Amino acid sequence: MLSITILFLLIAEGSSQNYTGNPVICLGHHAVPNGTMVKTLTDDQVEVVTAQELVESQHLPELCPSPLRLVDGQTCDIVNGALGSPGCDHLNGAEWDVFIERPTAVDTCYPFDVPDYQSLRSILANNGKFEFIAEEFQWNTVKQNGKSGACKRANVNDFFNRLNWLTKSDGNAYPLQNLTKVNNGDYARLYIWGVHHPSTDTEQTNLYENNPGRVTVSTQTSQTSVVPNIGSRPWVRGQSGRISFYWTIVEPGDLIVFNTIGNLIAPRGHYKLNSQKKSTILNTAVPIGSCVSKCHTDRGSISTTKPFQNISRISIGDCPKYVKQGSLKLATGMRNIPEKATRGLFGAIAGFIENGWQGLIDGWYGFRHQNAEGTGTAADLKSTQAAIDQINGKLNRLIEKTNEKYHQIEKEFEQVEGRIQDLEKYVEDTKIDLWSYNAELLVALENQHTIDVTDSEMNKLFERVRRQLRENAEDKGNGCFEIFHQCDNSCIESIRNGTYDHDIYRDEAINNRFQIQGVKLTQGYKDIILWISFSISCFLLVALLLAFILWACQNGNIRCQICI
């Protein structure tokens, strides 16, 4: 009978862990069935409710002509445009933020080279405009406006229209030319001039009489002197001769002097340089469309608010930083702990310590309760807003840390500068590696902060409720409180909004707590009672067995013999 009584008490204790009939209020946070994995400082895989992708991987298949002004070189590169090659007349007076050079651009005039090609290309691109100022040059006793069959314009022999090919006069004279131009303006001037390299000595004397010729161009701070390199070269457009083009910048107040006895390709004027303009050049086959974007790459325009992109390392304009990662996710919600599918609303209710609540859609944090009036769920907007306020602006702050006009253009070097090109590539690769690492670290820091903030707000809400209830309720250890007094919906609401008065319910709660705890058995007493029950049961069983043996012996039913 004692064993049966003890077993009943144990069953009663086990059932007391379920709903006892007292009001219960639980605290929890929002959850979704499938969250998003993000990286933090301490964990590579943390599931959060919501996250935002920071790396743009999509681009438009076209270049946007707005708001940046684009000029399409079409069949002309920017140097041919400055020289005035046939087919480049559409570039006269052109103005741009980005000059689009096409891979299909071709030379259409006398074959030439530019010893310092990339520097000239960069100066022209940065200038942002072909603003050519024609000048009068008084050349002495030479023939001007030379033409070539390699340079057709409207099927007629012509030449670069920004340059003047000087040859000997009809009287076979090419006297020394010495001409000075003073820059009296308030801007720097760019002069482009050239030296012709005939293919034979005969061609040299036929054109210039003097052999060898010489060209010297000087300013107050520089001098370039070139002697023609006479010799046959591979035939290009019917010519085995070549022209080498040079350039000279004349600052305000400076002057330029042309001195030659032959082979000079003279300028017809100068280009006005704009020191305030910061334009650039992009080599791509992507067509120009009608879209709007501030960022261009060699693969197309990017229209995004994301701070990073992994589309192309060559980018121009207000562009996201290029990183090597294909994805970086910024946590914009709390840690996600999906609700167990088998758990009902109550009965096996649990708070935030065990799992989140998928039904909590009006806020990030909230309450569930059960009392005599039924059950209910409500969001806690104050703690939700406190968390949102700290998380909102994270993306903007991240963009501010990385948002600058970022121009990364492809650089080219002459073959003799291969070591410089290798070094430049190494520097660029190192910079990209550094940016990629910094981006990943920055996002991980922000994600760690987001999760810490949201966890902190949950703990603050729990502590606020615990301080309100005090001994009027018991912490169940799973985010729930069992309340030891009658608590209707208005009472529950006072707990939620922070107006709960502990003293009003104190006496009732103390009485109910003692009554309930009088029949509750703690886990320590359970073990003692189990051992006592087992011992008593064994003792009773042994006593009954001995009593039966004694009774049987007395009646002669059992005989015991002892042999020595």
Curated annotation (Swiss-Prot):
One annotated GO molecular function: host cell surface receptor binding
Membrane topology qualifier: Single-pass type I membrane protein
Record-level GO BP terms: clathrin-dependent endocytosis of virus by host cell; fusion of virus membrane with host endosome membrane; fusion of virus membrane with host plasma membrane; viral budding from plasma membrane; virion attachment to host cell
Highest taxon of source: Viruses
Keywords: Clathrin- and caveolin-independent endocytosis of virus by host, Clathrin-mediated endocytosis of virus by host, Disulfide bond, Fusion of virus membrane with host endosomal membrane, Fusion of virus membrane with host membrane, Glycoprotein, Hemagglutinin, Host cell membrane, Host membrane, Host-virus interaction, Lipoprotein, Membrane, Palmitate, Signal, Transmembrane, Transmembrane helix, Viral attachment to host cell, Viral envelope protein, Viral penetration into host cytoplasm, Virion, Virus endocytosis by host, Virus entry into host cell
S-S bonds: 26-480, 64-291, 76-88, 109-151, 295-319, 487-491
Glycosylation sites: 18, 34, 178, 310, 497
Primary location class: virion
Covalently lipidated residues, kind S-palmitoyl cysteine: 553, 560, 563
Transmembrane regions: 528-548
Extracellular side: 17-527
Tagged with keyword Chloroplast: no
UniProt PTM comment: Palmitoylated.
A UniProt-annotated Pfam family: Hemagglutinin
Region forming the signal peptide: 1-16
GO cellular component, one term: membrane
Cytoplasmic side: 549-564
Site (Cleavage): 343-344
Miscellaneous note of the record: Major glycoprotein, comprises over 80% of the envelope proteins present in virus particle. The extent of infection into host organism is determined by HA. Influenza viruses bud from the apical surface of polarized epithelial cells (e.g. bronchial epithelial cells) into lumen of lungs and are therefore usually pneumotropic. The reason is that HA is cleaved by tryptase clara which is restricted to lungs. However, HAs of H5 and H7 pantropic avian viruses subtypes can be cleaved by furin and subtilisin-type enzymes, allowing the virus to grow in other organs than lungs.
Quaternary structure, from the entry: Homotrimer of disulfide-linked HA1-HA2.
Family statement: Belongs to the influenza viruses hemagglutinin family.
Task of the protein: Binds to sialic acid-containing receptors on the cell surface, bringing about the attachment of the virus particle to the cell. This attachment induces virion internalization of about two third of the virus particles through clathrin-dependent endocytosis and about one third through a clathrin- and caveolin-independent pathway. Plays a major role in the determination of host range restriction and virulence. Class I viral fusion protein.
HAMAP family on file: INFV_HEMA (MF_04072)
Name this polypeptide is given: Hemagglutinin
Phylogenetic lineage: Viruses, Riboviria, Orthornavirae, Negarnaviricota, Polyploviricotina
Gene name, Swiss-Prot/TrEMBL: HA
